[in-house]
Amino acid sequence: MAARKAGLIALFDVDGTLTAPRKESTPQMLKFMQELRKVVTVGVVGGSDLVKISEQLGNTVTNDYDYVFSENGLVAHKDGKLIGKQSLKSHLGDEKLKEFINFTLHYIADLDIPIKRGTFIEFRSGMLNVSPIGRNCSQEERDEFEKYDKVQKIRETMVSVLREKFAHFNLTFSIGGQISFDVFPQGWDKTYCLRYLEEFNEIHFFGDKTYKGGNDHEIYESERTVGHTVTSPEETLKQCSVLFLGKDNGSS
């Protein structure tokens, strides 16, 4: 096997790119990523916290990849070691956080949707995750809400209201996954992780939500990256096989 190509990194979104949404990575994908690491530096960047990313990619995720950026890179690991951490609480302050959370909970309380469960707002190190149905819902309920949301645009409408109400907070709202959206200060999207990748002059990013409003859009459009849109983990395998391993096809 040839030596790694210097100055090049393959950077991957998690949900919809390396795994099905909120599902565990397949053995095939885990094996492929280790093969890929032999020829290029490999990193992952997800909106979820490290616990959730570990559930999907394995408990040894920070050692299985060269870079692991959880919460869009607001929590950053390199070679298994923590190299950076940003705090939403320190940035916004408790008063603004309370104002935003109170309004959002009132909005959800008044929201008429078929079902609601629990954990409507999840407080993470560098962002808030807001779910109209509640993160405690089952996988079947997730799938049903996703279909309902595509028609009724529950998340899109809610984001529009919050964006207008809290314009003075300078927040970014990013819809991702099946049931929720992330809220964080402007500039704290996935492009945040690029500050840790100054040594790379060729950054290939792979993601599924690369459209405007999707949580992969900003990094996909960044002038520092070569963006690749995928629709499934299977397509990720195929594109990477052609790009980096010189194969005509990936998974069969």
UniProtKB/Swiss-Prot annotation:
A Pfam family recorded for this sequence: PMM
Cellular compartment(s): Cytoplasm
Annotated metabolic or biological route of this protein: Nucleotide-sugar biosynthesis; GDP-alpha-D-mannose biosynthesis; alpha-D-mannose 1-phosphate from D-fructose 6-phosphate: step 2/2
EC number: 5.4.2.8
Tree of life domain: Eukaryota
UniProt-annotated binding residues for Mg(2+) 1: D13, D15, D208
GO-annotated molecular function: metal ion binding; phosphomannomutase activity
Positions annotated to bind Mg(2+) 2: Y220, T225
Binding site for alpha-D-mannose 1-phosphate: R22, R124, R135, R142, S180, D182
Cofactors that this protein relies on: Mg(2+)
Reactions the enzyme catalyzes: alpha-D-mannose 1-phosphate = D-mannose 6-phosphate
Keywords: Cytoplasm, Isomerase, Magnesium, Metal-binding
GO cellular component: cytosol
Swiss-Prot/TrEMBL GO biological process terms: GDP-mannose biosynthetic process; mannose metabolic process; protein N-linked glycosylation
Active site (UniProt): D13 (nucleophile), D15 (proton donor/acceptor)
Subunit organization: Homodimer.
Membership in a protein family: Belongs to the eukaryotic PMM family.
Role: Catalyzes the interconversion of mannose-6-phosphate to mannose-1-phosphate, the precursor for the synthesis of GDP-mannose. GDP-mannose is an essential sugar nucleotide for the synthesis of D-mannose-containing cell wall polysaccharides (galactomannans and glucomannans), glycolipids, glycoproteins and the antioxidant L-ascorbate. Can complement the yeast temperature-sensitive mutant sec53-6.
Protein name listed in UniProt: Phosphomannomutase
Organism of this sequence: Solanum lycopersicum
Native organism taxonomy: Eukaryota, Viridiplantae, Streptophyta, Embryophyta, Tracheophyta
